[in-house]
């Protein structure tokens, strides 16, 4: 897209002929559609400016444009006119990232959040035992727990949207070192405007080309944001695994959709396939962030010289997270079954439910109730009802404990 819109601007400004501009745009658009993919053998691990890839692109476009035009098209003089690898490659990386974030990851996160909100609403009165340090705490509702997950996903989307304007500042027009040598005045802003119209994204020319080309802070920020999204999804996936553990020897409070046989030796075993997939994706995204962080240390004087691996790492994270969030939504969250009775029993058996009684009967008396329930082999709920120390039926009391401010 960068080459196509640069050709249009070069044609408009008289740098190349109108017919050549049309031919270059047609060739570039064919590549965007996936044609001639076999003409790009250059590996991502190359010179740090991305010059190898930029020249590969220039040469393929020039060759195809010459076929279309019926006259020679030069890869440097015509296709790369008003450009340098040093501004074109990082611009292409940013355009690709912004477009993929807007068209794949953000919509997927929105869908996941909607499914979590729906699950939360359906279980706003389903009482369960909260746990801190993996130990019983006080009652809450499953709806409250899932609502926390939904808010985390919502915040992930907000973080992405907040950093998009910085990622959408394009170095194009800065040419070799940011001075704009050999590029006509206004070239960068004109290309950014055309890219905005083409992608419906708000691209702008970098406010300072020296910053945009000598460092890649916006790309690193995007990678770090992907890490936060990954860690958020990892937390949800970890909770799903734990809540669905067992079912007989674990918590077993939810039943995750069964996607495949869980063992080649243990018949009937079902594993939390999707949550474990999400957690592995999170591990990879954290690794990609570490790669981008190290790559940022290769910003020296007027150029960052690790652009290819930076771009690859960010695009990998976006792709992985979009797929992981989509599968988590469609293959897990929407199919979760909740064992309400097991949640209720676990809550009633927990010593933590006397917490609400402590202000009325005193800490020591509440502690004594816990010990008596253990000695008699009954649940605290049963003992509380026997002693008539609760102000309401235990089910109502447990639900009331989840909303103490009401």
Write out the residue ranges for each language-model feature.
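Conserved, well-structured ligand/cofactor-binding cores
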Residues: 1-406
